[in-house]
């Protein structure tokens, strides 16, 4: 044990859906913790990532994308995203530099002003040439003159090291909250459910992924060090079941195989995965499911 001075800082990553929040968190902690898919609104709850760099422990909060919510679940997701802003020491507002600032982006910027928050703006996806980048920079310098701007590529890691040095410079002397090799404080059951939900998002079409959730009912470490996982895919309508199962169960078997591969990569042990489908009408309006999803 050393007597080095310990520093900590909590960092919230907020922005529109598919702006690169989850990719950035995964890049910083060096592990695929937060699920990533081409579909918007993949992240539903706050995903906590932890990285310890020498004397500094950084606690990162990946949040659901900010959009115009309609249903009860969507509204809960947006509330969840903003809730992390209040408690964080530093706010990173990530912006997709390949797109112009739209109404939702302007609403986010206005909300920062209302909350008296000075965010750090991350202009993401600079690995691809953008005709909007300079205009976004110019606009932000006028509307948020106190904020720093970091052009980055979360996917390739460009300028992420510069960002990390800045984050470390803002950390305060305080005992670490976690062990230096921890990457998250999330329960393993929750992480396992997220991994399977990612495969459902990647392998089911149109709106169906948004109509389901996944719960890990059993997470058991066996004597041979392997893990047995029982999960329930909860859907709101009976007719969704046939789509998820596929012909002769082929679809759910394929999803199970892909999910098991990802689970084994994350937990570094063999995994025995068993998937079940359960109909629970109006689960999106049930607070018990929100508690499980941590929103």
UniProtKB/Swiss-Prot annotation:
Q: What exactly does this protein do?
A: An essential GTPase that binds both GDP and GTP, with rapid nucleotide exchange. Plays a role in 16S rRNA processing and 30S ribosomal subunit biogenesis and possibly also in cell cycle regulation and energy metabolism.
- What CDD domains does the record point to? Era (cd04163), KH-II_Era (cd22534)
How is this protein named in the record?
GTPase Era
Q: Which organism is it from?
A: Rickettsia prowazekii (strain Madrid E)
The record lists the lineage as:
Bacteria, Pseudomonadati, Pseudomonadota, Alphaproteobacteria, Rickettsiales
The yes or no answer to whether the keyword Transcription is present is no
Q: Where in the cell is it found?
A: Cytoplasm; Cell inner membrane
Domain called KH type-2: residue spans: 204-281
Q: Name one GO cellular component term.
A: cytosol
Q: Where is the Era-type G domain?
A: 7-176
| UniProt keyword RNA-binding, yes or no | yes
């Amino acid at each position: 044990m050393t007597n080095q001075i310990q520093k900590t800082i909590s960092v919230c990553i907020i922005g529109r859906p598919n702006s690169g929040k989850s990719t950035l968190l995964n890049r910083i902690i060096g592990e695929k913790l937060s699920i990533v898919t081409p579909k918007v609104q993949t992240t539903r709850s706050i995903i906590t990532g932890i990285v310890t760099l020498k004397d500094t422990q950084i606690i990162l909060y990946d949040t659901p994308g900010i959009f115009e919510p309609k249903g009860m679940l969507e509204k809960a997701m947006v509330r969840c995203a903003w809730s992390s802003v209040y408690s964080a020491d530093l706010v990173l507002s990530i912006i997709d530099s390949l797109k112009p600032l739209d109404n939702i982006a302007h609403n986010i910027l206005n909300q920062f002003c209302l909350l008296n928050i000075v965010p750090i703006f991350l202009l993401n996806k600079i690995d691809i040439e953008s005709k909007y980048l300079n205009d976004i920079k110019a606009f932000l310098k006028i509307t948020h003159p106190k904020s720093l701007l970091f052009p980055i590529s979360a996917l390739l890691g460009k300028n992420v090291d510069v960002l990390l040095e800045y984050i470390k410079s803002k950390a305060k002397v305080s005992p670490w909250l976690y062990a230096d090799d921890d990457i998250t404080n999330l329960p393993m059951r929750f992480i396992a459910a997220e991994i399977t939900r990612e495969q459902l998002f990647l392998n089911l079409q149109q709106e169906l992924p948004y109509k389901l959730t996944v719960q890990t009912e059993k997470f058991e470490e066996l004597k041979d060090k392997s893990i047995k996982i029982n999960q329930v895919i909860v859907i709101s309508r009976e007719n969704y079941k046939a789509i998820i199962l596929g012909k002769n169960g082929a679809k759910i078997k394929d999803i199970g195989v892909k999910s098991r591969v990802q689970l084994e990569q994350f937990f570094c042990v063999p995994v025995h995965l068993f998937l079940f489908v359960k109909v629970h009408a109006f689960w999106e309006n049930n607070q018990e499911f929100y508690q499980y999803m941590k929103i």
